[in-house]
C-alpha cells in the first residue's frame, strides 16, 4: 500500500503520509517517503512514533487542523481492508466523501477483470477500476 501513496506524494508534492504498522520492524520505505513529504508513523505497540492505530493518529491530526485546512485535503488510503475502513470512517467525520480515494489490498489473480478476485463489495474491480476507488457519497 505504501508504494502507491509514496508515488502520489512524490509526483504531486505537498503531502503528508501517515504510516501504520504493528511494530517498528514492520515499517518499510520510510526514508524514501521522508525525502518527498512529511511522514507521521503509528505503531500498535508504540515501538515507533505514535502508540496506537494509524486511524487514531489520523483523528488526532485532523482535530488539530482548522476547518479551512481540512477543506483543502484529499485522502488516498492504501492498505488492508480493516485499516482502510477505519481511516475512511475518520475521514468522513471531517470532510466530504468525494475527497476520499481508497485502494484496499485485495488479492489480484488475472489482472484484467475477468476472475473478480479483486472485486470490492460494490463490484468494482481494483485491477481495472482502480487502483484507487472513490468513496461513495451515499
Q: What are the residue ranges of the model-derived segments?
A:
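Functionally engaged cysteine thiol sites
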Residues: 78, 110, 127
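Iron-sulfur (Fe-S) cluster-binding segments and ferredoxin-like electron-carrier domains
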Residues: 81-82, 86-89, 93-94, 101, ...
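Generic structural "secondary-structure junction" signal
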Residues: 56, 112, 134-135
Amino acid at each position: 500500500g505504501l508504494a502507491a501513496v509514496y508515488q502520489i506524494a512524490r509526483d504531486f508534492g505537498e503531502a503528508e503520509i501517515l504510516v501504520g504498522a504493528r511494530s517498528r520492524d514492520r515499517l518499510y520505505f520510510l526514508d524514501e517517503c521522508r525525502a518527498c513529504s512529511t511522514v507521521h508513523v503509528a505503531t500498535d505497540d508504540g515501538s515507533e512514533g505514535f502508540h496506537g492505530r494509524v486511524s487514531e493518529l489520523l483523528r488526532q491530526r485532523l482535530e488539530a487542523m482548522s476547518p479551512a485546512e481540512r477543506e483543502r485535503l484529499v485522502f488516498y488510503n492504501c492498505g488492508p481492508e480493516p485499516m482502510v475502513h477505519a481511516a475512511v470512517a475518520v475521514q468522513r467525520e471531517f470532510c466530504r466523501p468525494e475527497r476520499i480515494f481508497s485502494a484496499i489490498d485485495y488479492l489480484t489473480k488475472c489482472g484484467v477483470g475477468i476472475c473478480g478476485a479483486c472485486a470490492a463489495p460494490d463490484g468494482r474491480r481494483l485491477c481495472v477500476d482502480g487502483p484507487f476507488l472513490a468513496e461513495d457519497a451515499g
